Amino acid sequence: MQYTKSKWIKSEESILEANNESRPNLTKYSISLKPRIEAVLKQMDFQVSKFDKILNSLKSKDNELFRSIISSIKENNTHCYDKLLSDLLKSRKECKVVSLSKIVFEKLETKLKTASDFGDLVIILSPIISVVKNLRALLILYTPESEQELGLISELLGAILVDAAQVAGYTVNFKTANEEAMRLIDNAYLIVREKIKEEFSDLSDLSVLHSQRHLV
C-alpha cells in the first residue's frame, strides 16, 4: 500500500517509531484527519455567514425601533415608549450574543487552520470545544436551531481531539482548557462592546430626550 505524506506525518512518524509500530499503520491516523478538519471548518464558515445575516437583520430592526422610540417620545406616548424600549434592549442583547459568536468563530477558524501536527491539534482543540459549548448555551436563547448545528460541530471537534490526543500521547488538561476558553470569550466580548458603541445609536440619548419631554 502506498502511503501519501501529509502535514501531519512528522508527528505521526515520531509517535509510531517510539512505539515500534510499523509504517503501514500510519494510514489509519492520516486518512480521516484532514477531511474531518475541513468538515469542521466548513461548518464554522457556515455559522459565520449565518451570524452575519442575523446581525444585518438586527441592525435594521434596531434602527427601526430607535426611530419609533423617538416618535413615541415626541408624541408623549409613554406606554408605547416603554414597550419599544424593552424590545430594543432585547434586540441589543441578541446582537451582543451573535456578534460575540461571530468574532469567536472567526478566531477559532484561524486557530484551527494554524495547526501543524497532532500536538498542535490537542492544544488548540481543547479550549475550542469548551468555547463552542459555552456559545451554544447562549445562542439557543435566540436562535434555537443553533443547538443542533453547534452540537454537530462539538461532536466533530471532540472526535478529532480524542484521536489526536491518542496519537500524540497527550492528556487533555480540561482545567487549563476551560480557563483559556474563558479568556478567549472575554477578549472577544471587549471587542463586541466597542463595536456596539460604534455601530449602534447611544441609548443614553433616548433617556435624555425622554426626560426633557417630561419636563416640558
Label each residue range with its predicted role:
Residues 69-73, 112, 116, 142:
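Secondary-structure edge/capping motif, primarily at the C-terminal ends of alpha-helices
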Residues 83-86, 100-103, 107, 123, ...:
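Amphipathic alpha-helical interaction segments
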Residues 61-65, 101, 131:
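Amphipathic, well-ordered alpha-helical segments in soluble domains
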Residues 1-56, 115, 120-216:
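Long C-terminal interaction segments enriched in charged/acidic composition
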Residues 91-111:
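Amphipathic alpha-helical coiled-coil segments
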Residues 52-95:
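N-terminal interaction modules that seed assembly of large macromolecular complexes
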